[in-house]
Amino acid sequence: MKPRPDLADARTMPGVEVFQLTEGPLPNSHVYMEAQVFAPDSKRFVLHGGAYAHGYDHRDPKRKYLLCDLEQGGRLSPLTEEVGACAPAVSPDGRFLYYFVDETAPQDGRLTLKRVGLDGSDRRTLAVLEGPRPETGTP
């Protein structure tokens, strides 16, 4: 983590410190404000890394979710490997990241629900929806 006092201004509350968490050529950003991305202890959280700072192309092979561990000096560890990873959520107990892998296409494709431990272990596929769903009324 790199201290960035230059990002604070006169409106910044006293005692607030600003740090840069990432380095490198690819932009990184928060996932989205209402997403459950913090572990219950607030010492670890998930952020988005990829070719676009805000918004994304879910087919971008550089796009991934990273775990930031503040107790390890802001160390970043990749959590997802798959192209199409989206909609991340940290479990209420803080042990897992749940996410979808979007390989959908009009009238075809697959949507997969996966999970991985925040330590990178116990990677599992939990459910797969393939092709058009009859209950949606699409052929």
Regions found by a protein language model. Give the residues of each.
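Predominantly five- to eight-bladed beta-propeller fold
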Residues: 1-13, 62-63, 110-111, 128-129, ...
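A short helix->beta-strand "capping" segment at the edge of beta-propeller domains
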Residues: 9-29
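Signature of short aromatic-glycine-proline-rich micro-motifs recurring in repeat-based ectodomains
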Residues: 29-40, 138-139
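Conserved loop/turn motif of beta-propeller repeat scaffolds
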Residues: 41-42, 51, 94
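Residue position within the beta-strands of beta-propeller blades
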Residues: 44-48, 97-100
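Structural motif
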Residues: 54-66, 106-115
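Short coil/turn linkers that define WD40 beta-propeller blade boundaries
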Residues: 73-74, 121
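Asp-box/WD-like beta-propeller blade repeats and closely related beta-sheet repeat scaffolds
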Residues: 81-139
